[in-house]
Amino acid sequence: MNSSYTAIEPDEPLDSPPSYSANDHNTTTNTTTSNPSTQPYVNQPQADQPQQPGTSSSFEPRTLLQRLKESSHPIALLFYIFFRVSPIVTYIFGTIVIHQFTSKNTFILHFIVLILLVAGDFWNLKNISGRLLVGLRWWNETTLIESENGNGNGNASGQVGESAKDFENVWVFETADPNRYINPIDSKVFWLLLYGQPVAWVVLGVLAVLKLQFLYLLFIIVATSLSMTNAMAFTKCDKFGKANNFANDVFTRAAGSMFNNFNPFGR
């Protein structure tokens, strides 16, 4: 209380010391009575704390439809998710669904549906989803290479030698303008499912070997080869580092964890 009065002491006359004593009692009573009035304002945020869950509801996990609305190409993203997930789901639960309709030729119908879904996934990813979601596309083309196959001895017509025609298989990678905006939701879903599907097929292939399902293993080999082809092609096509950084991060973490587990000197 003394420090508070020193700030206002020069404003009061020096010849009236009793007024200070009187004011001391008044101010002390005022401060003591004013404290209860100020305490509700201090404790008022504590009373309002039950309203915080209402404000935290905006931070709840968003649903799939809400994320699709934030996508730049929601229809393309929806078809991409469908074609990437449906072959694996059909492989696991397809026979159960087919048995609900017919019990004849179950394996043949299941195999045909799987082939159609894998082919549709390969075409959609290669031609539509990669171009719209991340601005990448690749294709394969065959070029003609002409090479002279002569021995250097000319003939009467002046021809030096015959030209041999050969064909070369060329991979063409196309990347969009680096200044183009890539939606982060589209990019994350694209790269996650691009690398996640081959891993799922490998796991299912191991299970097929353990169950001695060699016909299904043949299909899994085809599906894995198509999925790995798309994964490697889009990784090479991405020359601006969107996939390379993601793949390098995953591979370095996996290699580091394996090295730490098998390193006898690190323990």
UniProtKB/Swiss-Prot annotation:
Residues 26-38 have a biased composition (Low complexity). It is a multi-pass membrane protein. Keywords: Glycoprotein, Golgi apparatus, Membrane, Transmembrane, Transmembrane helix. The keyword Membrane applies. It comes from the Eukaryota. The gene is TVP23. GO terms for biological process: protein secretion; vesicle-mediated transport. It is found in: Golgi apparatus membrane. The chain crosses the membrane at residues 78-98, 105-125, 189-208, 212-234. Residues 39-59 have a biased composition (Polar residues). This is Golgi apparatus membrane protein TVP23. It comes from Candida albicans (strain SC5314 / ATCC MYA-2876) (Yeast). Glycans are attached at N2, N26, N30, N127, N140, N155. Residues 1-59 are annotated as: Disordered. Pfam families: DUF846 (PF05832). Golgi membrane protein involved in vesicular trafficking. One of its GO terms (cellular component) is Golgi membrane. PANTHER family: GOLGI APPARATUS MEMBRANE PROTEIN TVP23 (PTHR13019:SF7). Its main location: Golgi. Belongs to the TVP23 family.
